[in-house]
């Protein structure tokens, strides 16, 4: 899939970009280079290849480095709600905006 200068002009118009002729030519070259890479990746047969969440998992066992989900802050709900105009059962009350 190769883009034309007309395509780049339309993309620039939609993005509200003002491109000079030199910028438009450079953008055309960059976008076509990107689409060339995408086409080459599409051509690779990946049937039977398991997806990787990190490239390291292809060469070694990788454990997810996630922290334990633990509460680290104290509950300050009541203090935070002191300045609210209306609170009920620990919830902020707001005016109805959609009828």
From Swiss-Prot:
Catalytic reaction annotation: L-glutamyl-tRNA(Gln) + L-glutamine + ATP + H2O = L-glutaminyl-tRNA(Gln) + L-glutamate + ADP + phosphate + H(+); L-aspartyl-tRNA(Asn) + L-glutamine + ATP + H2O = L-asparaginyl-tRNA(Asn) + L-glutamate + ADP + phosphate + 2 H(+)
EC number: 6.3.5.-
A GO term, aspect molecular function: glutaminyl-tRNA synthase (glutamine-hydrolyzing) activity
SUPFAM superfamilies on file: Glu-tRNAGln amidotransferase C subunit
Keywords assigned by UniProt, alphabetized: ATP-binding, Ligase, Nucleotide-binding, Protein biosynthesis
GO terms under biological process: glutaminyl-tRNAGln biosynthesis via transamidation; regulation of translational fidelity; translation
InterPro entries for this protein: Asp/Glu-ADT_sf_sub_c, GatC
PANTHER family assigned to the protein according to its UniProt record, in alphabetical order: GLUTAMYL-TRNA(GLN) AMIDOTRANSFERASE SUBUNIT C, MITOCHONDRIAL
Family under the similarity heading: Belongs to the GatC family.
Its biological purpose: Allows the formation of correctly charged Asn-tRNA(Asn) or Gln-tRNA(Gln) through the transamidation of misacylated Asp-tRNA(Asn) or Glu-tRNA(Gln) in organisms which lack either or both of asparaginyl-tRNA or glutaminyl-tRNA synthetases. The reaction takes place in the presence of glutamine and ATP through an activated phospho-Asp-tRNA(Asn) or phospho-Glu-tRNA(Gln).
Subunit structure: Heterotrimer of A, B and C subunits.
Name by which UniProt lists this protein: Aspartyl/glutamyl-tRNA(Asn/Gln) amidotransferase subunit C
């Amino acid at each position: 899939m190769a883009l034309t200068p007309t395509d780049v002009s339309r993309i620039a118009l939609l993005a509200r970009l003002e491109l000079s002729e030199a910028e438009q030519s450079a953008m055309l070259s960059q976008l076509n280079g990107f689409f060339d890479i995408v086409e080459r990746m599409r051509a690779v047969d990946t049937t039977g290849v398991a997806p990787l969440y990190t490239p390291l998992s292809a060469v070694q066992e990788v454990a997810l480095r996630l922290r334990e989900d633990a509460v680290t802050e104290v509950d300050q709900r009541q203090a935070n709600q002191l300045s609210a105009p209306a609170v009920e059962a620990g919830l902020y009350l707001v005016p109805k905006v959609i009828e």
